[in-house]
Amino acid sequence: MLARASYPFKLSSGQFLELGVQGYHGRFVPQTQAIPVGGGSVTPSRPDEGVVDERVAFTAVWYPQPFGVETEWNLGRGPELSDDGTRVESRSLQGGYLQFNYRQAKAGMPLFPFVRWQYYDGGRKFARNAPHSNVNEMDFGLEFARWSELELTVVYSHTFERTRTSVFPYGSAKGANRVGFQAQWNY
């Protein structure tokens, strides 16, 4: 089951504020694989019908005219590997982001510089065995949208902490930096 409700308000300044709430409830069947435990290996068990996966999130968007703020925070329960590594169970999670942006449009060249902090503490359900994941990152970026059909973005990210969930034992990256580029075609 999935539901979302949001409502935009036009403020006296002409700027728009949109508030929303969304949530879902269902079951998720995570993939599992053997992990090394004490000289042997164990494949974590999970319910055949899947693990309870439910969340509620709150959203607020103050659309940039020229300054804007966007945030979303979610709370819930989802698949996560147990502390002893023998089963995938439903455990609490939380996370979200806060983004500040600015719309600058000079000579038909719209630029959107932004700063975004993102945080997550919970199971990573799409990774094998749904291990616990911590994410705490800060992004600095610039989006260029000269044409409505094409958006180009460059982002510098600083990772305060991010759990590496691809290989057991699940370690943590701290103090990492990366640069990303994205081209998005809108049709």
Whereabouts are the PLM-identified features?
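Outer-membrane beta-barrel pore domains
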Residues: Q15-Y187
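Internal alpha/beta core interface subdomains
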Residues: M1-Q22
